[in-house]
Design a protein with these regions (language model features):
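N-terminal alpha-helical modules
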Residues: 20-126
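Bacterial N-terminal signal peptides that target proteins for export
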Residues: 1-9
Length: 126
């Protein structure tokens, strides 16, 4: 993603006024949590499926090595995603706290969708 701050600005400019006019702060936080939870649910499903595929398609020692590397990669990616979202949220510094929270949740979901694509397009055989 070349310009994450621009993505956040575009989201805020296009969608947030409508959302904010119809929702209170607590409703906005609930929507942000819903966006994040759904993206994480899809990410976990893709991750679990990849682990199953690795274990099914490889002998035990190789499978465990690959699964270990995948877990290491996933932990690092999660740290990156969370740090990137925090950076963009602070850098953007637009709107109210609730609007930033919703924008950051949407940006996090976009990063998560990219990771899901990465996990579902790993070449097979491993």
């Amino acid at each position: 993603m070349k310009h994450p701050t621009k993505l956040l600005f575009v989201f805020v400019a296009l969608f947030l006024p409508t959302i904010l006019s119809a929702q209170s702060g607590s409703e906005i936080y609930a929507e942000a949590n819903k966006i994040s939870a759904e993206a994480d649910k899809q990410l976990n499903a893709a991750y679990d499926q990849l682990i199953k595929s690795i274990r099914a398609d490889n002998e035990k020692d190789r499978a465990e090595l690959l699964v270990g590397r995948l877990k290491e990669s996933q932990r690092a990616w999660l740290k990156y995603r969370d740090a990137q979202v925090a950076f963009v949220g602070i850098h953007a510094n637009i709107g109210s706290a609730s609007s930033r929270t919703l924008g950051m949740a949407s940006y996090s979901a976009e990063l998560t969708k990219e990771r899901i694509k990465d996990l579902t397009t790993v070449p097979n055989p491993f």
